[in-house]
A protein has these predicted regions:
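Catalytic-core elements of nucleic-acid end-processing and repair enzymes
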Residues: 1-276
């Protein structure tokens, strides 16, 4: 390597996407855990920054009786168990399987990988005109969130000795997409109507839910999506199905709205995008 190929960080020019990624990773790494598989930190991306952290079963159902929501949940479990031969799955495993396939459940799906969270915030081009958001949940020493390992059961959500309203657990390894998405789930208790509240609003004023968020500018979504695809984070990388591979190819060949950012920012003069 010749001397003119040896460059320093300050010599590198960053465009808007690289600046965003550097700021986002720096923000995410403010909280880190080592040497454990306990689900202590999780990321979830929303294509629209105004969407609430409410599970699909409970959206727009604030007036529903909790008993009715439980009946819906039982029906989802029964239908998936019978239709897809999941007799050896526990109830919570069936719910995780159903959630990965789009069924309404009271699970919120997260990832231990901050870039998977980012992918979900930018993957849907129909929302490119609005800013997205990535949520970070830090469960370490929270009075409201209980990290669970091993044999977590559905009934623990309501009848657990910890008395916490939110439980967080890793997606069961037998579910195909678990490894691809590095999946984590949260489940809210049916007690006191916690399940119909946005997760970041659960608790009392003196017990704040440990959730932060990082905004994704609408102007960067397209280029972020293509940059993540170059790193293997695309529909096929996330879902692994033939349909997802077709979606990935369609996105790869579609250049109709592609416009590379011309903004160049010195690495020595960077500033952080909006984080909360």
């Amino acid at each position: 390597m010749t001397s003119d190929q040896n460059i320093k960080v300050d010599d590198v020019k960053l465009d808007g996407v690289c600046l965003f990624l550097a700021a986002y990773l720096s923000w995410a790494r403010q909280f880190r855990v080592f040497a454990t598989r306990m689900p202590l930190i999780a990321y979830r991306g929303h294509a629209c920054g105004t969407w609430k952290l409410v599970p699909s079963l409970c959206r727009n159902r604030e007036s529903y009786n909790i008993r009715l929501l439980k009946q819906y949940e039982d029906e989802v479990i029964r239908e998936f168990r019978n239709r897809f031969k999941l007799s050896d799955y526990t109830d919570i495993e069936v719910l995780a399987y159903a959630r990965h396939h789009g069924a309404p459940t009271r699970l919120l799906d997260w990832s231990s990988n901050p870039f998977v969270g980012l992918w979900f915030a930018v993957s849907d081009k129909t929302h490119d005109s609005v800013s997205g958001v990535i949520f970070q949940l830090i469960a370490g020493d929270s009075d409201l969130v209980s990290p669970r390992m091993g044999n977590f059961k559905l009934e623990h959500a309501e009848n657990c000795g910890c008395k916490k309203p939110i439980h967080i657990f890793s997606s069961p390894s037998k579910i195909e997409r678990t490894e691809r998405q590095q999946s984590i789930f949260t489940i809210a208790s049916l007690n006191d109507g916690c399940v119909i509240k946005p997760l970041d609003e659960v608790g009392l004023p003196q017990q704040k839910m440990p959730v932060r968020k990082f905004l994704v500018p609408a102007a960067l979504k397209l280029e972020l999506r293509r940059t993540l695809a170059e790193l293997g984070l695309d529909a096929y990388g996330i879902y692994g199905s033939a349909d997802a591979f077709g979606e990935t190819l369609s996105a790869l060949f579609d250049l109709s709205d592609f416009n590379v950012s011309s903004e160049i920012i010195s690495c020595a003069k960077t500033h952080s995008p909006t984080a909360e």
